[in-house]
Amino acid sequence: MAASRRRVFSLPVAAACLVVVLLRCLSASGEPLPQYYNAIFSFGDSFSDTGNFVIINSGKLPNMPKFPPPYARCSNGRLVIDFLAEAFGLPLLPPSANKGTNFSQGANFAVMGATALDLKYFKDNNVWSIPPFNTSMNVQLQWFDEVKQTICSDPAECRAFFSKSLFVFGEFGGNDYSFAWKAEWSLEKVKTMVPAVVASLVRGVERLLDEGARHVVVPGNLPAGCIPITLTMYPSEDRSEYDPRTGYLKRYNSVALYHNAMLRIALDRLQRRRPEARVVYADYYTPYIQFARTPHLYGYKRGALRACCGGGGPYNYNMSASCGLPGSTTCEDPDAHVSWDGIHLTEAPYRFIANTWLKGPYAHPPLATVVREDMVD
């Protein structure tokens, strides 16, 4: 019995020690990274959007962040892509929709609501809970082709330029599954989308590699069952649907887990086919789960399942009074929250995640390792 008690006691202590060590390593590894990249190009959805949605929609966005337009973000501050740019000594990425901008140091093609699959897929499958405009992955790649013409003039020059650029391709897929859930698809039916979504992502990465890209970061999905909008829209009276430790909805996280597992397998295969490149899988899921399990250890005193900015309710998310709309309020301590508006994150977790992608352990391999190995070669 005594041995059993020691084991039970040691598990949370060990977890706490691991978190403390990780935080110390991240804070201690603040030396500047090599100024290796000449540009960064980002694709994805609202977790990376730095203004495209605002520009496309004539500046009409309920949740207006604290950045001046056209660099509006769905957060109270910087995103992962911003911290990556800063780490490599590059300016924050301008949105590609801001025509006339100099994109010689990078561009951001990400748009809130973007999907991995084209609009036609959803219409063909009677999924109509989608944005009225098409900003899918393939559309963003078309925008990249347009921007490319302003950066370089011939294929050889372009390949040389992109070989020294960093590409961040995603997160994609979260919106695809979200729209299917809204169409009342079953768990089993939503999971049937995953192979198509992953195959689309791999084709997109291959297209960038064919353009000359050598370093591509591909983020996985976040745990949708931890996000306040999911917890609010799909409550269950069956307590077994919830994780007893954290309170997240297990079925929605299971789709993200399946997506991420299939994506990693597909990226490993792609890496073997394209040994001249480094394809990095970047993990959103694991750090978010850690925030949900032990938020206080990361400084999130208000937890991971309740939004900072919202219109009330158990998770401070209300569709009729979402962040920025009448009836919503904003907390005084955003850094004590993981969730900003019930969908997106506050700046603090984005900073933490970016550091783990740069230094490890939540990127495979870490970007700092990729750069230093490439410089040696």
State each model region's role.
Residues 2-377:
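Conserved active-site regions of diverse hydrolases
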